[in-house]
Amino acid sequence: LMVGGHYTYAEVPLFDTIKELFNLERNNYDKVGHFVQGFVPAIIAREILIRKNVVNAGINSKAWLNVFVISICLAFSAFYELLEWWVAIASGENAEAFLGTQGYVWDTQSDMGVALLGAICAITFLDKIHDKQLSKLRP
């Protein structure tokens, strides 16, 4: 993600090459960042909710845990998008460069959608591994 901070998310060279190779309209490096923005907080939120026993063991506890984790990730993503918007308003003329929308009117919504995908992937692919690691910590 620091690479995007160095070049700006819309101008990361590797993703410019990918854009040219696949004849894409935009540099999609920011989507990688937003995927991670959903993936990493999902595991953190899941662990906190489990360790703090927020969702009690029961018939639908795993489903509710997943709902809460995804909701937390989407709230985090929405807050980040609002923060981007506020910084863009405050900075004025360089708002387009900061936001990296590249003329895509649905950029904010797609960023949140990719964060949602990241959260779902984390829950789907890491829940069993995460549960096994957490069980080793319990006495």
Labelled PLM ranges:
Residues 127-137:
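Membrane-interface capping segments at transmembrane-helix boundaries
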Residues 1-39, 43:
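"…centered on the first transmembrane helix and the immediately adjacent amphipathic helix/loop
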Residues 36-53, 89-92, 112-129:
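Membrane-interfacial alpha-helical segments at the cytosolic side of multi-pass membrane proteins
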